[in-house]
């Protein structure tokens, strides 16, 4: 009798606990960038880098992953590293009113699968790699091609090689690189050197 009563009490407690669980729909509304918004790969402030940005919402994650280049977001989506299914990808519409290369905008997010991309243009993204420049309008993308070169493609037509191939960003060290290396050389060596 005691075992039966214990079983009934445990079953009732489990039923109550499962009834308390609320299924809350995850928000996938695009979020604006702030001074605290960091790129997923580079962990650098996105507002300090030019060019269009992207954000990816993963199932179960409270906030999106931001990317300093659209190219990087497409590469992430095609790679094996996702920790959860992708719900949606948003990209800056570079044809939106007020969007510039230095200020790609907020509030002009469009679904990545609906965008038209200019690939192979003279423009480089925020991390110095070739960029897949998104537009909500094919006509805006075509106008960008006339000014900057490249070709207009749908997301499905962008090949893996266009976003996954390593890119040389220049072999000449920049002045700030030399300054940094000089400061590193000036540090005392841990072995007493």
Swiss-Prot record:
One of its GO terms (cellular component) is plasma membrane. A lipid is attached at residue 20 (N-palmitoyl cysteine). It is a lipid-anchor. InterPro entries: N2O_reductase_NosL. Coiled coil: none annotated. This is Copper-binding lipoprotein NosL. May act as a metallochaperone involved in nitrous oxide reductase assembly. Specifically binds Cu(+). GO terms for molecular function: metal ion binding. Monomer. Apo-NosL can form homodimers. A lipid is attached at residue 20 (S-diacylglycerol cysteine). Residues 1-19 form the signal peptide. Pfam families: NosL (PF05573). It is found in: Cell membrane. Keywords: Cell membrane, Chaperone, Copper, Lipoprotein, Membrane, Metal-binding, Palmitate, Signal. The gene is nosL. Belongs to the NosL family. Gene3D superfamilies: 3.30.70.2050, 3.30.70.2060.
């Amino acid at each position: 009798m005691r075992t039966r009563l214990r079983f009934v009490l445990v079953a009732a407690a489990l039923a109550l606990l499962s009834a308390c669980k609320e299924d809350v729909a995850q928000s996938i509304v695009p979020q604006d960038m702030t001074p605290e918004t960091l790129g997923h790969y580079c962990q650098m402030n996105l507002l300090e880098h030019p060019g269009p940005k992207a954000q990816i919402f993963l199932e179960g994650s409270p906030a999106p992953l931001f990317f300093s280049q659209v190219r990087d977001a497409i590469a992430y989506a095609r790679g094996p590293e996702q920790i959860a299914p992708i719900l949606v990808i948003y990209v800056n519409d570079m044809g939106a009113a007020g969007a510039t290369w230095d200020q790609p905008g907020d509030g002009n997010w469009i679904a990545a699968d609906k965008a038209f991309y200019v690939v192979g243009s003279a423009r480089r993204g925020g991390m110095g790699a070739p960029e897949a420049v998104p537009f909500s309008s094919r006509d805006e993308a075509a106008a960008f091609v006339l000014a900057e070169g490249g070709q207009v493609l749908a997301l499905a037509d962008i090949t893996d090689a266009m976003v996954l191939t390593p890119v040389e960003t220049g072999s000449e060290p920049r002045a700030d690189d030399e300054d940094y290396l000089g400061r590193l050389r000036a540090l005392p060596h841990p072995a007493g050197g």
